[in-house]
Amino acid sequence: MQIPYRRVEEYQKVDIGALRPAGSYKQLIDKRTHPIDELVRQHGKIPDDLLIPRTCPTCGSADARHELDKDHLRIVRCNRCDLVYVNPTFDEAHYKRVYVSAEYQEIVRDLGIKSHEYRTKRFGQERVRLMSDQLPGIASPRFLDVGCSTGFVVEAARDAGWDAIGIDLNPSAVEYGQSRGLNLRAVALEESGYKPGSFDAVSLFDVLEHLLDPVRTLRACAQLLRPGGIVFLYVPNYDSASRMLMGKDAHFIWPTHHLNYYTPATIRDLMTRQSLDTVYLATEGLDLVDYLWYRREVQGRSDDGVEEIADLLQFFVNAGAYGKNLRVIARKQTR
């Protein structure tokens, strides 16, 4: 399928100050490698006995070539399906500890909770509208947001009259959403107990890139859908302007946390392998904002002329399929 045509008049700007409260994004970047810092301090690297070889998480092939190294970890490209992924990795228990750690909860508080209301209005409502477009004739869709964080999409869906539920591993995020009256649970998908075929829509926003086995999770989500139901996901776009401008310094290349890197082609391939028909694919990002931040904070340079037209440039980046985030809606086949 083709990237949809977009009109510049429809471009919605992002209030960076509201999205990223003062200091919160820098804190996230500064603590990027914190889970491995002590290991590297003691050993000069990540000890080999802590790392586990991994085959391609999409097609299962072990045939891959070196792509790049960052943060003492290796990223490779599958020679069969072209997926880019981290290999080797830590075990699953390591990543679960990271996402429930006190430090990660602090990051969520500073970045997610403080911007929750803005995220609900700017992003939550937009995502609900995009899902609604794919669910005609369903007055009150039943919706599950997997990895819901503070529940800003769940809140927008609830306010639109949906039966909206969210699950997340981070207890601080879930507790905050519950304090707003949202139906959130601090539970893993595989332990949630939801019945197959019980949802009209399931979302995975900024989730698949974190998983050792994204196919297992995507398959579980597909099983929860009724025939004709949709899965809506966001993942970083490896073919984005961010990587073209900053190379491996692009912020989304974060191998201590992001284990899988998709392109429009490889994300469509993943959907097809799970009998999901891609019905919507677009890109959206803050590539120019992140690049200007990088130039200013890391390189000590200023690009005032670019800053003045960054929003307009970002529209064309998004429309050309080079935005930092891939937005994909895929439908469960009815046959």
Describe each PLM feature range.
Residues 1-205, 215-219, 283-284, 295-299, ...:
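Conserved N-terminal segment of class I S-adenosyl-L-methionine
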Residues 40, 232-260, 265-272, 293-299:
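Short, glycine-/aromatic-enriched active-site segment of Class I SAM-dependent methyltransferases
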Residues 76, 209-213, 262:
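Residue-level signal for the nucleotide or nucleotide-sugar donor/cofactor binding architecture
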Residues 136, 212, 226:
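Short conserved AdoMet
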Residues 203-212, 234, 257:
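Short catalytic micro-motifs in class I SAM-dependent methyltransferases
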Residues 212-216, 243:
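Short N-terminal helix/helix-N-cap motif within the alpha/beta-hydrolase-1
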Residues 215-230:
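A short glycine-rich, Lys/Arg-flanked "PGG" loop and its adjoining helix->strand segment in the class I
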